[in-house]
Amino acid sequence: MKPLVVFVLGGPGAGKGTQCARIVEKYGYTHLSAGELLRDERKNPDSQYGELIEKYIKEGKIVPVEITISLLKREMDQTMAANAQKNKFLIDGFPRNQDNLQGWNKTMDGKADVSFVLFFDCNNEICIERCLERGKSSGRSDDNRESLEKRIQTYLESTKPIIDLYEEMGKVKKIDASKSVDEVFGEVVKIFDKEG
């Protein structure tokens, strides 16, 4: 059985992680956050990638695609090896740019099917406020205004064109993420009840 993938995209602070947690609970998907996998790998003293990842994350840059895909693939393989029924994955914060998308197509072509792209559309200022609020308790080194403005810039220049590309293929489900968590999830449920 091949993995069925939903890409979850949106700017920093659009609520991707929060909504993914709820989708997992209600629909039994496995949530893979590209950013989280990279952050965990960075902390792993045995990792061959740790220092490199640290450098990219600190500078607000996008980590080389080979690293990210190998981590995502490892997680999908492990999940499905443990339980063959668990073949539905939410991949959050990926693909972030053209390079990511090409890398995915090259490595995963025929090995995984992308059902659709869930796009959380959110006003930049709202996103920044949410992240600054989160930064007070998250301890994430990139939840500060300077890093955030860089991340939003990167998102607009690199990720938005990917969303537009999938839009042309009719694969994007767009949600207004500036509303409350419950309202946003209400919209998510409508999509997943239909798409599954």
UniProtKB/Swiss-Prot annotation:
The gene is Cmpk1. InterPro entries: Adenylat/UMP-CMP_kin, Adenylat_kinase_CS, P-loop_NTPase, UMP_CMP_kinase. Gene3D superfamilies: P-loop containing nucleotide triphosphate hydrolases (3.40.50.300). Belongs to the adenylate kinase family. UMP-CMP kinase subfamily. Consists of three domains, a large central CORE domain and two small peripheral domains, NMPbind and LID, which undergo movements during catalysis. The LID domain closes over the site of phosphoryl transfer upon ATP binding. Assembling and dissambling the active center during each catalytic cycle provides an effective means to prevent ATP hydrolysis. It holds the Pfam family ADK. It comes from Mus musculus. ATP binds at G13, A14, G15, K16, G17, T18, R134, K179. It catalyses: CMP + ATP = CDP + ADP; dCMP + ATP = dCDP + ADP; UMP + ATP = UDP + ADP; a 2'-deoxyribonucleoside 5'-diphosphate + ATP = a 2'-deoxyribonucleoside 5'-triphosphate + ADP. The modification N6-succinyllysine is found at K106. One of its GO terms (biological process) is UDP biosynthetic process. This is UMP-CMP kinase. CMP binds at N100.
